[in-house]
């Protein structure tokens, strides 16, 4: 149970998550990190089985590094999404319990956002929410999203969306993590109030 949000705008991609880690209705951790940096230009959110996601995202991180070494450029995000889709599809009937948002900026497609589910289904989205709090977050996204919004407005909308989920979903809480990915790279927004963006 969790809430993860992704928003793609012209300038880049915003990923936001809550920090509560649960096992059923047991709160296992209050400072969980649910955004996984795959490379400087791409990251993923974690919703579902933690061990399954860590395994898959570790593989994608390794594959991205191998690609960069071999081809001297960052891996296209669509290639990463295709890898994870094939792994999930061909793991049947022993499915990975995962639901992830993969987003970033590459030279092939610009700012892109994909949703991948446990069966290997891939959809390209402008905005998306996953996890138990997603109905509440998606409502805020539907009302607030505009195609011409700035990156700063997208950060504000992502924060509002996760806050809406935290207010209504017992599986979400303990704070919000926000990441921004632009052509300059991966940046973590440390405090929503100050809008301080620090390069990682």
Swiss-Prot record:
Subcellular localization(s) per the UniProt record: Cytoplasm
One CC-aspect GO term: cytoplasm
Pfam families membership: Proteasome
Propeptide part(s) removed at maturation, as residue ranges: 1
Activity regulation as described: The formation of the proteasomal ATPase PAN-20S proteasome complex, via the docking of the C-termini of PAN into the intersubunit pockets in the alpha-rings, triggers opening of the gate for substrate entry. Interconversion between the open-gate and close-gate conformations leads to a dynamic regulation of the 20S proteasome proteolysis activity.
Principal location class: cytoplasm
EC numbers for this chain: 3.4.25.1
UniProt KW keywords: Autocatalytic cleavage, Cytoplasm, Hydrolase, Protease, Proteasome, Threonine protease, Zymogen
InterPro entries: Ntn_hydrolases_N, Pept_T1A_Psome_bsu_arc, Pept_T1A_subB, Proteasome_bsu_CS, Proteasome_sua/b, Proteasome_suB-type
GO molecular function ontology, one term from the record: threonine-type endopeptidase activity
Location of the active site: 2
The reaction(s) this protein catalyses: Cleavage of peptide bonds with very broad specificity
Transmembrane segments: none
Gene Ontology BP annotations: proteasomal protein catabolic process
Similarity section: Belongs to the peptidase T1B family.
Function: Component of the proteasome core, a large protease complex with broad specificity involved in protein degradation.
Subunit structure: The 20S proteasome core is composed of 14 alpha and 14 beta subunits that assemble into four stacked heptameric rings, resulting in a barrel-shaped structure. The two inner rings, each composed of seven catalytic beta subunits, are sandwiched by two outer rings, each composed of seven alpha subunits. The catalytic chamber with the active sites is on the inside of the barrel. Has a gated structure, the ends of the cylinder being occluded by the N-termini of the alpha-subunits. Is capped at one or both ends by the proteasome regulatory ATPase, PAN.
Protein name: Proteasome subunit beta 2
Lineage, uppermost ranks: Archaea, Thermoproteota, Thermoprotei, Thermoproteales, Thermoproteaceae
Gene: psmB2
């Amino acid at each position: 149970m969790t809430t993860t949000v992704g928003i793609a705008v012209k300038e880049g991609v915003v990923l936001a998550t809550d920090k509560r880690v649960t096992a059923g209705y047991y709160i296992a951790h209050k400072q969980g990190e649910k955004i996984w940096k795959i490379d400087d230009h791409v990251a993923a959110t974690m919703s579902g089985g933690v061990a399954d996601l860590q395994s898959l995202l570790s593989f994608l991180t390794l594959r991205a590094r191998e690609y960069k070494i071999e081809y001297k450029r960052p891996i296209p995000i669509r290639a990463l999404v295709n890898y994870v889709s094939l792994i999930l599809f061909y793991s049947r009937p022993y499915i990975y319990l995962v639901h992830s948002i993969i987003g970033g900026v590459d030279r092939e497609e610009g700012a892109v956002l994909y949703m991948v589910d446990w069966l290997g289904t891939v959809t390209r989205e402008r905005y998306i929410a996953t996890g138990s709090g997603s109905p509440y977050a998606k409502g805020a996204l539907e009302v607030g999203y505009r195609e011409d919004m700035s990156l700063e407005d997208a950060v504000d909308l992502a924060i509002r969306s996760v806050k809406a989920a935290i207010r209504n979903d017992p599986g979400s809480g303990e704070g919000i993590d926000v990441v921004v990915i632009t052509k300059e790279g991966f940046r973590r927004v440390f405090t929503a109030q100050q809008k301080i963006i620090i390069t990682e």
